Amino acid sequence: MTMNGRLLYVVGPSGSGKDTLIETARRTLPDDVDVKVARRTITRPVGHGAEQHLAVSEYRFELLAAAGEFALHWQANGLRYGIGREVLSWLKDGTTVVVNGSRLHVGEALAIFPDVEVVHVDAEGTLR
C-alpha cells in the first residue's frame, strides 16, 4: 500500500508502558500535529488495562474480519486484535497513525505496510 502518512507500529512486552507512552503522546502533542491513534478492536471486556479499545465477542470479531473491516488483525495472548480500515484513509491523507501492535506479528504489518516504522518499547522487569 502506498502511504502519504507514516505508520508507527508500537510493540513490546506486556507491562512495558506502550499504552502509557501512546496516551501521553496523544495528550501532549500540539493540536496542529496530524497524528491519530488507532483504536483497537479486541475480544476482551472494556476495563482490562489502560487502553480504551472496542470490546467485541469472538463471533463479532470473526464477522468483522470476514467482512474485511480490519486493515490488520492478529491473535496473541488468547485474544484477537484488529485495526480498523479507517487507518488506510488516514495514511492516504498524510496522517501519522500510531498502532499498538504485536511483536510476533511485525511481519504481517510489514507485508501490508512496507514503509511501517516499528517502535520497540521495553522496560527492565523492575520497572514493570
Segments (PLM) and residue ranges:
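ATP-binding Walker
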Residues: 16
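Post-Walker A helix-loop "phosphate-sensing" segment adjacent to the P-loop in P-loop NTPases
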Residues: 27-37
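Walker A/P-loop
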Residues: 19
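ATP-dependent small-molecule kinase phosphotransfer cores
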Residues: 40-97, 101-105
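P-loop (Walker A) phosphate-binding loop of NTP-binding proteins
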Residues: 11-13
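Pre-Walker A (Motif I) flank of P-loop NTPase domains
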Residues: 3-8, 94-95
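Conserved phosphate-donor/acceptor-positioning beta-strand/loop module used by diverse small-molecule
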Residues: 96-102, 112-128
